[in-house]
Amino acid sequence: KFYQSLVTLMEEKIDGSYADLDFNRIYGSGQSAGSAATQGFAVTNPEFFAAVGSTSAAAAEKENSAFETIPTMLIAGQMDLGDMPKGFESTSLQNWAKYMLKANGIDKEFTAEDADQHFSADSRHPDVYSWTKTIDGVDVPLVQWALCLLRPHNCYPSDMPMLWDFMEHFSFEKAEDGTITRYYSASAFERDDAVILK
């Protein structure tokens, strides 16, 4: 109830005179415990966010998992806590990815070979992996993972633009009955190129 009350209060108070918010583009992010909370809400309450992107903690399937589409990105550090530095061999990352791939309707494994896209974002993130779903002829990256080189359990400034570059392409609308419609835009909504996530 807190989330719904907070958003309702913000919608009532933010009228554009001081600030303006696009309530169709609410994103979740965080590091460490913040990442665990964000990814946890993505599992249990995906209706909170248009997309999530976080660093250094994962979530997995829970008893109250929603199994609904939620675009997600996770970055781990090469010297991070737990087993995350193991990458594809990490149990925590495997559990996170298994849930997220299933929730997003992608029938693939969390392996480098099964990733649909593999690219270098910058010198700290030379290996970014994406699992996509083709919707109306557009390859939509719904699950993305990267390892940040030489990073312990913290955030580097280079992590944040990567998370934003992922999340900014997604939006959502909530109908009166609570139905969620999600959108992906390759141009980050600068052009009329949005496709509905099905």
Residue ranges with predicted function:
Residues 20-22, 43-47, 64-68, 132-142:
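Extracellular/periplasmic catalytic domains that process cell-envelope and extracellular macromolecules
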Residues 53-60, 77-81:
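Active-site nucleophile loop of the alpha/beta-hydrolase fold
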Residues 37-41:
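Hydrolases whose catalytic domains are alpha/beta-hydrolase-1, hotdog thioesterase
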Residues 83-91:
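Short, flexible/disordered intra-domain loops and linkers
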Residues 47-58, 71:
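A conserved short beta-strand
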Residues 79-84, 152-154:
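Acidic catalytic loop of the alpha/beta-hydrolase fold
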Residues 73-75, 101-197:
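C-terminal catalytic histidine-bearing segment of alpha/beta-hydrolase fold enzymes
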Residues 1-33, 43:
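Gly/Ser-rich "nucleophile elbow"/oxyanion-hole loop immediately N-terminal to the catalytic nucleophile
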